[in-house]
A protein has these predicted regions:
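RNase H-like polynucleotidyl transferase catalytic core
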Residues: 37-44, 117-138
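Distinct, well-ordered alpha-helical segments
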Residues: 110-114
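Acidic/histidine-rich, metal-coordinating catalytic segments
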Residues: 16-17, 79, 91-108, 131, ...
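Structured catalytic cores of enzymes that bind and process phosphorylated ligands/cofactors
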Residues: 14, 81-92, 166
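The start of beta-strands in P-loop NTPase/AAA+ ATPase cores
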Residues: 12, 96-97, 124
Length: 188
């Protein structure tokens, strides 16, 4: 029902989720003999960056916030990013925003709940069961981002990985942009 409301333009439907990316190469769809250990020599210690993001159901636009840790502060920073894009703006009609999130610990902490409550006038949250990726549309996009844009690469540091994450999200958004001539209409 929410998807139909979003497609009709009554609401903005966002699917949210968090994931992590590593500075060392992630091997996606690599071939090896059965039982072989797939390891790629990489310099230094592997570092992680948390990717917190939302996917707009209608426009298929991916919004990503990279954070050094997967904590409530990163989720709140992502909410602030959503404020700028979807929050109420003076002089413009506001559409209600529905955010679909799982019940992960960073989404349900006291800080996160307080941040969500402060946005309750324009943002409502629908909670999925814990660790249930199937109903969340962002899971496939996140998998695509990691497997096709971030895999098989070694990043010098977390700054380079952060830049690569945002470039990959921009590339995905360009791929998913609707083509203006895709739905031709006959003018009357």
């Amino acid at each position: 029902m929410r998807q139909q409301q979003a497609e009709a333009g009554d609401i903005v439907l966002l699917y949210g989720d968090g994931s992590e990316a590593l500075t060392h190469p992630c091997l996606a769809r690599a071939w090896a003999k059965s039982g072989a250990d797939l390891r790629v020599p990489a310099p230094g210690q592997a570092r992680k960056i948390a990717m917190l993001g939302s996917l707009d159901h209608v426009t298929r636009r991916l919004i990503v916030h990279a954070s050094p840790t997967k904590r409530s502060s990163g989720f709140i920073a992502h909410l602030e990013q959503s404020d700028r894009l979807y929050g109420p703006k003076p002089g413009q009609p506001a559409r209600p925003v529905v955010l679909v999130e799982d019940n992960g610990p960073i989404h349900t902490s006291r800080l996160s709940r307080a941040a969500l409550a402060s946005r309750a006038h324009w943002l409502s949250v629908e909670w999925l069961p814990k660790y249930a990726p199937e109903p969340n549309d962002i899971e496939a996009v996140r998998r695509d981002l990691k497997a096709h844009h971030l895999a098989h690469q070694t990043f010098a540091d977390t700054g380079a990985l952060d830049t690569a994450i945002h470039q990959a999200a921009d590339a995905l958004n360009q791929e998913r942009m609707p083509l203006p001539l895709a739905r031709r209409r006959i003018s009357a």
